[in-house]
Amino acid sequence: MNNTRRIRMLIGAMIVAAAGTAAYAGVASHALHPYLALAVLVLASITSRMKVKLPGVNGNMSVNLPFLLTAVVNLSAVEAIIVTCISTAVQCWPRKNAKLNLQQMSFNLSMMSFASCLASLVFHAQWLRALPWSSSTLALVVATGSLFLGQTAPVATIVAASEGRNAWPIWRNLTQLSFPYYVVGAGVTSMVQAVSSHLGWELALAVFPVMYGIHRSYQLYFSRMAETPRQEVLVRAAGA
């Protein structure tokens, strides 16, 4: 099987998985929160354009994770999917004079929809709430882990198929690069929840400056990571 056919099969499987979970979410969703959903959607879409290039991987990472997690925690599964899909479309929309890659857009939308729906269903699952040691913090941790796996596993698989490589080392590299950010994202989301319970969600969503700071920090960190191999090559060339 050639790479092109394998990629198309993976994208098709991802679309089917996303459609299946979205259909289930439509049945299982709880009460809607239109005003909060709109506010989270606007902030998630704005921060989705704040991207950093992942070194060693053909892809980038957006810093809107806390808003996606906020949607997972506070909104219905359907609302979380809508917020995620629209902000993902904004993130992946090509810049001026660039051509839209429909295949890539289809994969990204279905992958993010599946991951967001999975995280939302896990967070609101009755079996998780019924555990003797269950808490909102535990539910957030499990939901964040579900979102992480729902995003990174399909990405590693599609990259491996397109480049003819093993998916495991690609996923491991993605984990090393992005897992700390998921931990930070869960922490920011927990902070938003704490502020929201005392001062209201309107003030809690004012974490945009925090996300901008995280964005700048990751830009500097990854740029230094990318520069280190280049400097090593130059040193070896100079000593040759």
Give the positions of each predicted feature.
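Membrane-embedded alpha-helical hairpins and interfacial helices in multi-pass inner-membrane proteins
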Residues: M1-A238
